[in-house]
Amino acid sequence: MDPTALVEAIVEEVACPICMTFLREPMSIDCGHSFCHSCLSGLWEIPGESQNWGYTCPLCRAPVQPRNLRPNWQLANVVEKVRLLRLHPGMGLKGDLCERHGEKLKMFCKEDVLIMCEACSQSPEHEAHSVVPMEDVAWEYKWELHEALEHLKKEQEEAWKLEVGERKRTATWKIQVETRKQSIVWEFEKYQRLLEKKQPPHRQLGAEVAAALASLQREAAETMQKLELNHSELIQQSQVLWRMIAELKERSQRPVRWMLQDIQEVLNRSKSWSLQQPEPISLELKTDCRVLGLREILKTYAADVRLDPDTAYSRLIVSEDRKRVHYGDTNQKLPDNPERFYRYNIVLGSQCISSGRHYWEVEVGDRSEWGLGVCKQNVDRKEVVYLSPHYGFWVIRLRKGNEYRAGTDEYPILSLPVPPRRVGIFVDYEAHDISFYNVTDCGSHIFTFPRYPFPGRLLPYFSPCYSIGTNNTAPLAICSLDGED
């Protein structure tokens, strides 16, 4: 092998594959490749990420464990010895001499973006071009390198944001799937428990549960695969960006001769680099939680719920039969009794729940905002209200026409393929069960709050929210369940 080529190969061997400069504090990983300690840290350290997160080698993509990183002292010694030769990775050993004329390379052709000697600059192909000393264009190209670097940094920041977003979406998906899985099990158990009080079971519920869970598992796996692919592609793009940024930083520190080497190719590649957006993936669960016949059982626990006008906020209009409520145009002159809500559009039912099972349905129609559920009898009605079980509220609500939530932001947004026009509420006091159902969607399950002992008596909760122009004006109406099939 030619000695010159051999030395060049050695110089390249002691360069970090990530930053393309001499290895600094070289670290070896499981697969045997070595990188700068700082490069690996920047590539792998993800704020707030667990150490159990999957890592791969930037070169061969082999799985590795960060805890197995080890310093490569022998390689570090070789790097220091090669550094004494005052060479740089990518420079080669032919130095500053023109291969054609043997003269020093010190001129630069602006049109062709080429380094050349004086003899080349006077040749016919360049005599009409603008050829200047290399130093005259050094700052111009340093600035272009800076602009390209800023562009890549912005792309890197966007890639990081997208990566964080994909991790959050993955976490949200896992929570939704686990919540739906729990709901399926609970709802079938509830059906069996309630049915045994009425008549012996006549269905193979175990097979129905297994089928529903199998469908959920298939859907979860398909979506999870897509989410993981998105995340993997973003990580790969981040790694490419990291290497390109490191290359530009290193190039800007080179002597002018080596900074300008192939400069146009580097700039074109950097400036044209564009982050590929992740594939849009719906997180809407298609496997619903639906138990055939459950609503018929729940209706046997129908409660005669009526609104208590003494609790109604001053702009809420309660019908004479106390079955409907809507938001009025003006404040009514009502006594400020202790039971009345002072700040919020809330009215409560008049019947206390302290034992037993109770079920009622409320027509919400095409309203864009509403809230339904139960609350403690002794909640604060004059100050700020937090719709959380911690503060005595078990409520689901619709906001902005399509955002369904259970309580406050402590629970994820609910996925409802069919917007409910009628909502069923079921309370089993002794079982600590507060559940909601989409009657419009054949009684599919909406949400069940985690089961904790209730801290006293409960009251039905209603909030028609505000009227928004001509929208959200229809009343909330408690439905009669008598005589229904």
Curated annotation (Swiss-Prot):
SUPFAM superfamilies: B-box zinc-binding domain (SSF57845), Concanavalin A-like lectins/glucanases (SSF49899), RING/U-box (SSF57850). A zinc finger (RING-type) spans 16-61. Auto-ubiquitinated. Zn(2+) binds at C98, H101, C120, H126. Keywords: Coiled coil, Cytoplasm, Metal-binding, Nucleus, Transferase, Ubl conjugation, Ubl conjugation pathway, Zinc, Zinc-finger. A zinc finger (B box-type) spans 93-134. Antibodies against TRIM68 are found in patients with systemic lupus erythematosus (SLE) and primary Sjoegren syndrome. This is E3 ubiquitin-protein ligase TRIM68. It comes from Homo sapiens (Human). The lineage of its organism: Eukaryota, Metazoa, Chordata, Craniata, Vertebrata.
